[in-house]
Regions:
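Short glycine-/polar-rich loops that comprise or flank the Walker A/P-loop
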Residues: 44-46, 86-89, 112-113
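Hydrophobic/anchoring residues in structured secondary elements
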Residues: 31-32
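Metal-dependent nucleotidyltransferase catalytic core
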Residues: 1-21, 50-100, 106
Length: 175
């Protein structure tokens, strides 16, 4: 089994556990970072965006709700073929409302994330609209060695204010 196949196996098992744990509350799930780009290395963690309705307030409460998922996956995450290190999950938890409010984290996701689960198209629509807005602004991701940054509006004038995506406007686009 190749490293990429191992990550694919983990993602399949993970999605099944997420659906079992969150049920109808699971709105969407995406993998980002090196695994989302399809370029994991030995020891790469699995960066996840979990969009779940009715999440408890606070990161610790959200992690506590996620712990059974991780526990059920322990054998898949730790038992690999010889030479494969254990794999860590790094979830980011958002409610649909928090996704609508936006986050700088989503900038890279429009290019690098792979949506694993999104039955209503919520996350795909959000990413599509954000991607379109970035294009409209002329935004670009500028690479410097192994790092990058975003130039969101190259023609920005001093004192000018702009929005990436109005909080509720994108909802109207999918209605």
């Amino acid at each position: 089994m190749t490293l990429l196949e191992r990550y694919q196996q983990i993602l399949g098992a993970l999605l099944a556990e997420l659906q079992a744990a969150y049920g109808a509350r699971l709105v969407a799930c995406a993998v980002f970072g090196s695994v989302g780009r399809g370029t994991p290395r030995y020891g790469s963690d699995v960066d996840l965006l979990l969009v779940v309705g009715g999440l408890p307030r606070g990161r610790f409460n959200r992690v506590e709700e996620f712990l059974p998922v991780e526990a059920h996956l322990e054998s898949v995450l730790t038992v690999g073929e010889t030479g494969y290190p254990p794999i860590a999950l790094s979830p980011v938890f958002k409610t649909p409302e928090e996704v609508e409010a936006g986050s700088p984290l989503f900038l890279d996701m429009v290019e690098d994330a792979r949506i694993l689960y999104d039955p209503q198209g919520f996350l795909k629509t959000y990413f599509d609209l954000l991607r379109a807005r970035l294009r409209q602004l002329g935004a670009r991701r500028i690479r410097r060695g192994n790092a990058w940054y975003w130039e969101l509006k190259p023609d920005l004038k001093p004192g000018e204010v702009f929005t990436l995506l109005p909080t509720r406007a994108w909802l109207e686009a999918i209605s």
